[in-house]
């Protein structure tokens, strides 16, 4: 039971880290003054993609783990290190490009692009044999809720909080990568 609770805590922290990426992007999208119905669909779509992408990643990760064993374990840890580092670096860059309007194909493209990193984390978790259902439900729930929160507070705090939330998420993934490689 203690191991299960520990796994839920670790997976929740990873879900928080991945959700912070969606949160930081949603902060900027909150400036578009979207309707509540649009915000609901945006959060729901991002949550769904944060279920599907790590699910696909976990399937590939389990296959790699069976085929390559301990080499895949180190690759999974290195992947988390790389992804965390990329998130931290991205948090310090300024991207003034025009945002996609979050409707129709634009929303699907947006949700896909925000959830790409959850595929990579799912790949690592698949290598380590994490519980699939718990993982995808936590990832989907955290990203959906954090997207909604980001959309709501985006008008007020985007300039201050945006890069810090992505840096925090990257730091969490970086820490897990170090843990997997060295502990």
From Swiss-Prot:
Cysteine disulfide links: none
Transmembrane domains' residue ranges: 8-28, 40-60, 72-92, 108-128, 133-153, 163-183
Keyword Transmembrane helix: yes
Full protein name: Putative manganese efflux pump MntP
Listed HAMAP family: MntP_pump (MF_01521)
UniProt key word GTP-binding: no
Family membership noted in the UniProt record: Belongs to the MntP (TC 9.B.29) family.
UniProt cross-references to InterPro entries, sorted A to Z: Mntp/YtaF, Put_MntP
Location in the cell: Cell membrane
Protein task: Probably functions as a manganese efflux pump.
GO CC terms, sorted: plasma membrane
GO molecular function: manganese ion transmembrane transporter activity
Coiled coil residues, start to end: none
Keywords assigned: Cell membrane, Ion transport, Manganese, Membrane, Transmembrane, Transmembrane helix, Transport
Membrane topology note: Multi-pass membrane protein
């Amino acid at each position: 039971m203690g191991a299960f609770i520990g796994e839920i805590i670790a997976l929740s922290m990873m879900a928080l880290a991945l959700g912070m990426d969606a949160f930081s992007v949603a902060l900027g999208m909150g400036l578009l003054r979207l309707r509540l119905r649009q915000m609901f669909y945006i959060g729901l779509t991002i949550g769904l993609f944060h279920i599907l992408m790590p699910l696909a990643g976990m399937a590939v990760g389990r296959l790699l783990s069976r085929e390559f064993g301990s080499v895949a374990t180190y690759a999974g840890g290195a992947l988390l290190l790389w992804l965390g580092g990329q998130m931290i670096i991205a948090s310090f860059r300024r991207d003034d490009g025009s945002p996609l309007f979050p409707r129709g194909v634009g929303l699907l493209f947006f949700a896909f692009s925000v959830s790409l990193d959850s595929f990579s984390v799912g790949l690592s978790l698949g290598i380590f044999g994490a519980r699939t259902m718990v993982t995808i439900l936590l990832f989907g729930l955290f990203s959906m809720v954090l997207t909604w929160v980001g959309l709501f507070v985006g008008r007020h705090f985007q300039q201050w909080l945006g890069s810090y939330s992505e840096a925090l998420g990257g730091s969490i993934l970086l820490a897990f990568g170090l843990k997997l490689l060295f502990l």
